[in-house]
């Protein structure tokens, strides 16, 4: 196999509670309650669509150590589907779902699934074309620099094919994110890794291209806060002759948060404000939108894209806001 693809996702936060506005109306609660799980379904669809050799998930599969039963069953169902299509899955746990906290209803994983332990960096070979390295968090508050535990360039002879490092960490001191497993870029580029599949930071960012150091962002936005706005999804990585040839973002979110400028200074009543908001929705091509907050000439909104369901049809998703929720 001279060329192949893999998918890099992180921070699924399955069954995230969207604390703040879930109880404002039944429709709001339903839309938000299902958003993270439907984004997971879309991730599974993407892996099958692009014929991915494997999927890496860089931490925070669940939103908290309690790991709700609904989220666990949905996650396992997605992994079973990927296993059926021959897609390997490699998972690390992060600060929201550490291995030694919470509980698990899953006693046996589907074939082809590997969950990295927390005692040391493990290596998993993928059909002779790649070696994936990873380590999970044993507890939520990990302060060690885990990047230094990965193979260094001096040991370059180790591993086969493309070397992928999966790590949940704060690289470069991102503001607004706890300094868990904090490291700097030199710690990452000094390792014998060709592609760093990072998680923890919810804003999508490519820190380096040689080697690749990538945050895909979270799978589903959770609030109108800066790092949660805009398109959310995963990265599709194309590999040719043992080297990364392309890294492409694919949006998978079911609910999207944006902040838009809407001039309502001349509006005579609330009905006119709503009319202008609807007009803005149409201009953006969104299925539906809702106002979150407003100030002089400024209106924070969230939008639902016209999303592809698991059955392949095009159908809109209702979009409603949430508060900031839990920190990442």
Name these PLM-found stretches.
Residues 49-51, 156-159, 283-284:
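Glycine-rich phosphate-binding loop signature in dinucleotide/nucleotide-binding domains
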Residues 247-328:
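Accessory, non-catalytic peripheral segments of nucleic-acid enzymes
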Residues 48-49, 80-84, 282:
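Residue-level signal for alpha-helix termini/capping positions
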Residues 54, 65-239, 243-244:
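His/Asp/Glu-rich metal-coordinating catalytic cores
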Residues 1-72:
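N-terminal active-site segment of His-dependent metallophosphoesterases
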Residues 3, 51, 192, 243, ...:
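Short loop/turn motifs at secondary-structure junctions
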Residues 33-37, 71-72, 143, 177-178, ...:
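A conditional alpha-helix N-cap/helix-loop micro-motif detector
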Residues 37, 41-48, 76, 147-151, ...:
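Amphipathic, non-transmembrane alpha-helical secondary structure
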